[in-house]
Amino acid sequence: MWTARHAVALLVVLTYAYSSILPPGTTFVQSIRDIFRFQEQLKKENVEDTICSETPPESSIPNRDELLELIRKSKIEDHKFDEHVRKKRQLSRISYQEYLDNLGKADYDVRIEEGWTEILYPFGTWAMDKQLMGQAGRETQTNLGFDCPFFGFRFNYTMVYPMGMLSFGLPPFSAPPWTFPNPAWPKQRDHSFVAAFYADAMFQWIGNTKISNVFFRSVHRPRLDDDEVYERNSQTNYGAPNYQQAGAQSAANQQFSNPSQYSQNLNAYSQNQQYNTQLLQQQQQIYGKRKKRQMPGRVSQPGMVVDPWLLDNITRHIQDGYTGANGFRAEHAFIATWYRMAHGGAARALDVSQFEHVKDWQNTFQVVLASDEIRTFAIFNYARLNWTSSNEAGGLDGFGGKQAAMAGFNGGNGTGWYGLPYSGEGRLWKLGYFSNVLTPGRWIHRVDEVIIPAGCTNASNGGMMTAPPWGPMHGGMAINVSGPCLRPADSVKVNFENWQTSCTRLSRVRARCIMPMFHKIGLVPIRMSRDGGQSFPFFGKFYVVNSERAPASVSLKDSVDNKTNRWYEPYAQELALGWQAMNLTWNTGARVDISLFGYWEDADRSHFERIDYLARGISNTGSYSFRPQQLTKQFLLRDAWQKFHFGFVQVALADAEDGVMWSKPTPFPWYHLHEWERYYGRNWPIDMCIEWFEYDGKRNNFQIDLTTDFPCPCKLPQAMLDLGRFMPIMDCDKDGDTSCPFNKGAQHCIQSVQPTFSGSSQQCCYDYDGYLMFTDDWEPDGDYTTFFQPGTPARAHRYGAAPYRLPPFIPTLSNYQLDLNPYRTCCKYADHCEFYYWRRMTNGCQDYRAPAAGYIYGEPHVITYDGIRYTMPGKGYYVLTMSDSPYHKLMVQVRLEQPDDTLWHAHVNATVITGVAVQENDSSIVQVYARKPMRRWRYRTDVYVDGTRRFFDKPHWKHQQFKHLDIRNPLQNMNQSEIVIMLKSGVGIRIFEGFGMLDVMVTLPPSYNTTCRPGESLSSSLNAPRGQRRCYTTLGLLGTYNNDPADDLTTPSGTVTRVQNPTTTASTTQMIYEQFASFWKIDGTNDKIGGVLFQDKFKPIYNPLLFAESDYRPVYWPQTIDMNASRVFTMEQVVSTCQNNPECEYDFIMTGRKEVGLTTLRRQKEFFALQKTGSKQLISCGPLLKKEGVVKTPPAANYLDGDKVVFSCKPKYYIHGDIERVCRNGTWSPGWWAWCRDRNLEYALKWMTALLSIFGISLIFVIFFCILWNIRKKKQAAHAERLQLKEQSDRLNKLENERIFGTSPEKTPLIETDFRSNFNMNQPSRPIPSQPPSSQYSPPVFAAPPPPSQPTRLPTYTNAISQQQRQFEPPRPPRGNMRFETSAI
């Protein structure tokens, strides 16, 4: 049973066992006290570590006497220990005796004993570093193993020097003082270098032991090319450094130093190991484990190792200190460490007892170049700086002298110098106490293109940085800002132009702000305050990108297999979207909301509101899909289906407002489909299209302004030449994106650069024959709808218009609602494009006037606006073209300098263009420079706007807007070798780069073409006093633009030099140079020209010394080849290469470079070809009207003067009208417009016509027969009447004769019968009663006729005749006895 006695016995045994292993002379109680004291000391050190101390802890290395005393005491106490413990103690003493010898090799982690783990990365032979030889100039060059961009150059090697620098070229080895860049370049070397401590230094020796060294190695990541997983500290990692073994070696030395420093966990990668491990484990869970890599052609070896863990640690330090490096990942690094270096001329220590004294005069620092072969960061780590000058510089004991040590970056070849604080001032030791990041003694800079410091500044004012430097105009994006160092109590606010936002402090170097919504695009000023908005002493610039061109953080995934499942389709069954989850938050357990934000604008204001949630509180997995039919709508906005027809998809954290992610603009037909069908019915597309058609027709006619201000060019060459007034549409560019989603069948589409007063934009498209496509040629046919979509004017410009904030001047959004959405509704959903094209008809080119173009190229050769060609070998700053008009105050200047020396080491006595500067009125000043040789691997030009460097290497940077001008770069041109500047007046300037030379083409709109009035001359106008009425025109090396070549060569004073082409002779070239071109040099002597637009900080790129010389004598035109040049090429080679082109031969002979001559030849041919077709004034008759089914031959829009158009019909149609028309003098030949009818309908109509014709003819015949029959009847009736009257007259005469002569008829006369039969056919005949015989004749007595009765109108001819017969029937005698009386006659 366990008792107290057993417990006491066990305690005594444990105490005895513990006392047996204690050092001699140490009691048990003292050891317990030491433990508590150690814990208190450890707590103090942990507290001190959390505070940024200015000085690193002092070293605890004992001196030689103390070392010997420790060894002697240790030997005396050996007999008290067991055999195995005694052996361990003996091995420890032996290793300590080797301490000094190993000190210079650093074959263990010396950072721990010196307290440098917080500032230096692992170095030494244990880390597989190579060592610099003690002899100067030997084994200094090393292979980096990667391409390292630095100051615009690109290097794959470096040279390590003891003087504290990594050089990319041989230094001049001149004595201080030094000046960088070297002003004597190129006569003297000006080497590129990275210097953490540029001063004469030497290795320190103690006796024959070297305790100083320079270590270096390159570090790389594993290559993902095998299945073996890279394991840290594995023996199979191709010789990677073993940090556990190095830590054990350092622990073995703890008895010779302060034991408290070794009680901590060894951290081979610097500070915050626990955080680093968690971060790496999290990354492994997300991205998987890294695989190891074997470097090309070799395994890991001293000086070149694989260590992804170290690269991750370097990446984290860069991301923590540099705002904007979150997307950076160090793939390679080069680490060089200068360990215990003494100043040049320092005394050599002879005994180890002098170690402490020597140590106090040593410098230890480190340079790290980390790169992903695109971006490069330089890290300077200063562990200990104890001297600042060398004896060679005149210093004494490491201080003073003519020039102290320098720290910074030199681009080399006269590129430029960037110095760190205190550089060359004798106070460089302060760099070890201060920092531009969070760790004292560490300085981080980005060095690939321009030198950009990381971190923050303690100055009271200065600049600020944003990351990213741009944002979408709809805002909501998280922007990191840095500039001043931020204290915990600081209240940070940032003004984005006029919008103030409150920011969250993240660390001492950065804060995070939420970008506000903008209604404009372009460069806006930003200001930063850390006192709550009372003052804004830190400033910078921020670029607002339009929503259409901004990179989409949320990707809307359209189905490839099923075209119905796309975001713009109304009947989509399933939709998917994705986003980068880690760009939103590193918290894998975070929840996100997915929302729909809609946009709508009326005539007064715009509305940007949340419509609904697609999902709430879902996991941040980076993807989401849903079925629109099963979507539960919350209807956050009432009647949103009537207005908010498009918008954005937003992904945001569900529980924090820490920035959001946006998609690109997208329509919402799948969301509003149910409401549309319920309101409009099944035919909702056509009803909505007609509704828009009627609404748009009530608005102002914006096309009137476009017809007068920006008529479309007639052909594609004109559109390509008109650089200042038109630019390509980004998604329909023959030199870029050719998808043309809204203009199928077009080869190239353009839009007007500047909007009209009403904010509209002209848009023109050209087919593959180069002709303008017209909406009049469209017809409602399936093929046309799919493959023929001409350009249409836009009511709202894609890039907006001033004042921007009001509709319809808002970039992208106004255009989407007023132009793109109606197109989708009418053309895509309703299949009735005719409604859209009736409201957006293509403008013709009848009013278009082509621009004039001038060109300067080669060395240099000039082609004026009116066609004069000459060569101008001047040097300096010259006026290329200018205008002093009150409406167009234009200035374009060029910088001409001599190129590189020839292969036979002779100066080229000709010049090339290396810089262009442009300004119009009060616009921004644009400067474009060529780059030095070896600096053209990534960018071919440098572009500065108002002194700020601008890049065009990303899709959303391809078009940028500034004050009164735009700059664009072709989409597929990633090296900035072509820059186009578009001024507000319509002037276009295209700059090409080739072999370090710039070619400049200037196009002027017709508004610059001015002709002096009668009685005025150009000379009198130029000399007229200001304020007096004068004739303004363009002047300069490109001549005057007035369609008169005679006065092209006019000086500022009005003197005209008259020449005629060709001018390719030495005498003519000299005359032009001396009498004309030299007067356009900007040297400050002519007030009419003005000053230089170029900034002084941008020096000549070839030879600044030659550029400054005034005794330059050009070669006007080479007649023969120099003797030295004949050893490189022959005249026969020149002639055969240049094809008898004088300009090509000039450049070939002067430079001795065949490629330069061929470039001149090619550029000249391209310009002449473009000018010939682009500057030609074309006469257009406009499109011819045609109906459905009409086929025009040729199929292109041949509507220009002299074009013949032949019309035909498709096989199922039949043509009508005139089938051939000719355009003459802007008018079509007379004729009926062609139209086609369906063949079946044509046949039916023809049969119907034939039948109707037959029926009509028959009817006409019947009618004609009836008419003739009626006429015949009338004639017969008239004839019968005449006969009746005649018979009656004859009968009366006969009766009279009988009375007179006494004869009487024996019977009734036959004439009575005939009369009855002829004149009263429709009534029965009534015989005349016989007269009783009487011997006495008595004339008949006629009674008075009865009153006439109204005859009855009968519709038939028979009744009419009968009525007529009754009318003309003679009176009949009475039936009784008739008594005739003698007639009066």
Swiss-Prot record:
Q: Please list the tissues where expression of this protein has been recorded.
A: Highly expressed in the intestinal epithelia.
- Ranges for domain NIDO come to 285-450
Q: Which GO terms describe its biological process?
A: cell-cell adhesion via plasma-membrane adhesion molecules; cell-matrix adhesion; negative regulation of defecation rhythm
- List each copy of the Sushi domain by range: 1179-1238
S-S bridge residues: 1181-1223, 1209-1236
InterPro entries listed in its UniProt record: AMOP_dom, C8-3_MUC4, Epithelial_Barrier/Signaling, Ig-like_fold, Ig_E-set, IPT_dom, NIDO_dom, Sushi/SCR/CCP_sf
**Gene3D superfamilies in alphabetical order:** Complement Module, domain 1, Immunoglobulins
Domain AMOP, chain residue ranges per copy: 681-840
Instruction: Give glycosylation sites per the record.
Output: 156, 313, 386, 413, 458, 480, 562, 583, 909, 921, 975, 1009, 1124, 1225
Q: Which UniProt keywords apply?
A: Cell junction, Disulfide bond, Glycoprotein, Membrane, Signal, Sushi, Transmembrane, Transmembrane helix
Subcellular localization, as worded in the UniProt entry: Membrane; Cell junction
Question: What GO cellular component entries does it have?
Answer: apical junction complex; extracellular space
The answer to whether UniProt assigns keyword Transmembrane helix to this entry is yes
Name the consequence of residue 1144 to Y.
Answer: In sa296; Significantly shorter defecation motor program (DMP) cycle period
The UniProt disruption phenotype note reads:
RNAi-mediated knockdown causes a significantly shorter defecation motor program (DMP) cycle period; phenotype suppressed in an egl-8/PLCbeta or inx-16 mutant background. Expanded distribution of inx-16 at the apical junction domain of the intestinal epithelia. Suppresses the long DMP in a gon-2, plc-3, or vav-1 mutant background. Similar brood size, developmental growth rate, and lipid accumulation to age-matched controls.
Using the record's annotation, list all stretches that form the VWFD domain. Answer: 852-1088
Sum up the protein's function in the record's words. May negatively regulate activity of innexin gap junction protein inx-16, thereby mediating the rhythmic frequency of the defecation motor program. Required for the clustering of inx-16 to the cell-cell junction of the intestinal epithelia. Probably dispensable for intestinal integrity. May be a cytokine receptor.
Free-text comment about domains: Domain composition is important for subcellular localization and function in mediating defecation motor program (DMP) cycle periodicity.
Name this polypeptide is given: Defecation cycle abnormal dec-7
